[in-house]
Amino acid sequence: MQVDEQRLRFRDAMASLAAAVNIVTTAGHAGRCGITATAVCSVTDTPPSVMVCINANSAMNPVFQGNGRLCINVLNHEQELMARHFAGMTGMAMEERFHQPCWQNGPLGQPVLNGALAGLEGEISEVQTIGTHLVYLVAIKNIILSQDGHGLIYFKRRFHPVRLEMEAPV
């Protein structure tokens, strides 16, 4: 199998891996930016740590690294349009994305999306290059939780809501 063919088959296989949709944001002396990401994973709860993978060619990387802090905003099912904005699918400029009334600064000064299922503010403790991506290890320092809303996942190259069904009485 050729390398390009294997790469495409791998990408097709990963499209079958349903993943939560997040907007990873940062603000500080290096600037403010954000990106939609599905390659986000918990690492450990002691101490709370998360892994975020971003394409090494992304113009956001110097901003994330320069600020040294970020927020992982776990989107709810009604925030698909915001996910599209931060994925660059709508053509909205970066600063305009943050001028929406749904943003506030968290205790670490990071952009936190109101209504997100969770906002995890943290400090970047390590960055490694693996193939085409940078892997950020983030030590979580502040957690904001919402009890409202359902999940939003990306599956087969499309966004899908994930709704909790009512449990039937036993």
Swiss-Prot record:
E.C. no: 1.5.1.36
GO MF annotations in UniProt: flavin reductase (NADH) activity; FMN binding; NAD binding; oxidoreductase activity, acting on NAD(P)H; riboflavin reductase (NADPH) activity
Catalytic activity line of the entry: a reduced flavin + NAD(+) = an oxidized flavin + NADH + 2 H(+)
SUPFAM superfamilies noted in UniProt: FMN-binding split barrel
Protein function: Catalyzes the reduction of free flavins (FMN, FAD and riboflavin) by NADH. Subsequently, the reduced flavins diffuse to the large HpaB component or to other electron acceptors such as cytochrome c and Fe(3+) ion.
Self-association state and partner proteins as the record states: Homodimer. 4-HPA 3-monooxygenase consists of a reductase component HpaC and an oxygenase component HpaB.
Protein name: 4-hydroxyphenylacetate 3-monooxygenase reductase component
